Amino acid sequence: MRKPLLLLLLVSVVLPGLAQNGKKVYADFHGVRYTRQHDGKLGRWEMYANTEKSITGRKSLCYNADLIDSEGRHEIAAVAYPQVGMQSNLDPDYIEYQILSAKVAKIDGFFIEWGFKPHENDILLREMQKVAAKYNFEIGVNWCDGWLYYDWITKIYPQINTREAKTGYMAKCYQYLVDSVFTGPTAPIVKGMPVFYHFGPGAKVDEYRKVLSEVKLPQGMKQPVALRRWADWGKLENDKYVPVTRSDEMDAWKQVGEIPTAWLPARVRTRDQEHAEWDNYATQDDIIEFMKPFRDSIWHSNNPAYTIKSGFAMP
């Protein structure tokens, strides 16, 4: 089946009874995918994108999941077709199937790609929590707060139309996460601390500092740990990938308690004959070089501010 597990966050932890390598494993969950039968719509199963700037020669991408071929397969936006067919992410039976499949794979929880309440991904989050509670499975967030700083929230609440107003609403969203996600039986907890992935690119550091100042933690809760996406691109020199080893922006995020964490490796090489269908790509050596700054400055660091260290794996 087409796995919704697009990335794995391997979180260092010293508690017994977890993964055999002593780490907790969280999988990023991208949604929401619907079906006509269950939801009356298709969601991320369909896709259209203008790709006129691509040097591959392909001018557009178009997947219409309402179209069905002679073998009964829908034209879905997916690299591989699901073994169980096209399903709705909100179907409790399918949620149960995915959670149990994840547990078999020694995955401890899902981080839902989430931007704000009441975005559709918040519905997915809450539906996941209902089923996860039955199976000792954790549901957290990959907080894409850029969604909040686009005009998406303004389309729902017209009065939230300035950065100041969006920052104020972000504080309410953080409080919601504290009250509804970082507590309870499905809370993602590592070493006694709630944890989430902070994708960005929404709030600036000063705005985020204001958000933190307005959030009230319940008695006994430790400050949630934010694993901050560090995805500086790097460059090619003499056909060798050279990663970014530090950045002023990431240093600023560390000042508000965020811990630098890897994301998708940089793809700095441009299309060639062997990679004709890609505008950019990376070699295996590039990927290793991309990860070295995280190894050297985070994993091997004795900095006590790095209370939780997270690695990254992508199938």
Task: Outline where the language-model segments fall.
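Sec-dependent N-terminal signal peptides
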Residues: 4-13
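Single-residue recognition of alpha-helix boundary sites
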Residues: 13-14, 203
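Sec/Tat signal peptide C-region and signal peptidase I cleavage site
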Residues: 15-19
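Glycan-processing catalytic domains of CAZymes
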Residues: 20-315
